[in-house]
Design a protein with these regions (language model features):
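An acidic/histidine-cluster motif and surrounding catalytic segment
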Residues: 1-70, 74-127
Length: 127
């Protein structure tokens, strides 16, 4: 199963350790990913947000219908569960979605739609 047609991951130039980590994680999952050079202003949180926007702009420019955007510290803890849940989500034509968040802290209230997904109105991440 091809998990994602297009995958972009954000990485700072000097974080070669994280580049190696992300590369190993993608290989483990069979994902072909493209590195995007992170934006690095003085404020790291702003740089992270700007880097995500950079990825979205790149995806729009390339006319990607869907894109998986992640950071270089991504870890797939349970690859089989992730693959199974993603396949169920993508295969469910009744689900309408614009953004799929695969990791974060969901803030109530949210709707548990299925065992493998919830409709979230607020999700906290580091940015």
């Amino acid at each position: 199963m091809e998990l994602f047609k297009h995958t972009l991951f954000i990485n700072l130039d000097h974080r070669t350790d994280r580049l190696a980590h992300a590369t190993a994680e993608f290989e483990k999952m069979g994902i072909v990913a493209e590195r995007v050079k992170a934006v690095q202003p003085k404020n790291g949180a702003i740089g992270c947000t700007m880097s995500h926007i950079k990825c979205l702009e790149l995806a729009k420019l390339r006319e990607y219908e869907q894109v998986f955007i992640c950071e270089d510290d991504i870890t797939f803890l349970t690859p089989d569960l992730f693959t199974r849940n993603l396949a169920q989500f993508v295969g469910n034509e009744d689900l309408r979605w614009d953004v799929l968040i695969i990791g974060g802290n969901n803030v109530p209230p949210y709707q548990q739609l299925h065992e493998y997904c919830a409709r979230v109105f607020s999700c906290q991440t580091t940015t």
